[in-house]
Amino acid sequence: YCLSKKSMSYHKYQKINSLSMLSAEGLRLLNERLPAGSDLLVLEWLERIQINILITRPRNSKLGDFRPPHKNRPPRISINSDLHPVEFLITLAHELAHAVNWNKHGRSAKPHGIEWKYEFRGLLLQILESGLLETKFEEAIKACYFKRESLASSTCRNLRRLFDIDNPASDNVRLEDIPVGSVFL
């Protein structure tokens, strides 16, 4: 796998490593964004799959994405650089589940189909069993991803709210926090 970060201008990729072990710079970039202690779990995941990881500028449309191999290019995951550490870890697990699903089933499996859900929940279980997360995050992840409810349900909104509350750098304003009768643009 390879960990890359877009340069300050976001026009070029800076390659960190393309071999089986992350470079010191790649580990630093990853550790900056992951919850404390989760780096070993992530390295274990990455040892099982050959993939490039790109840390990108913040995007409003998505938290991350997976691109399958194309021509001579290896598969690639991109993840936004501004995510809360737990959100970064969940997004990485989400995209790695796509990569594993692609390797096993190719185009025959739906991107968020049964096979993908199996892989994603397996990675989430590893996160939960590791004991690395605060209880509030563990409970919110269980409620959001291990119930039959839609991901747009209030349980997933509660997880999203935890990321916003726990991330002082976040400038997100929730509608429920705006006083009734307020005027805003």
Model-derived regions, located:
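Metalloprotease/metallohydrolase-associated module, dominated by Zn2+-dependent proteases
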Residues: 11, 22-69, 76, 82, ...
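Short pre-active-site segment immediately N-terminal to the catalytic Zn-binding motif
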Residues: 73-91
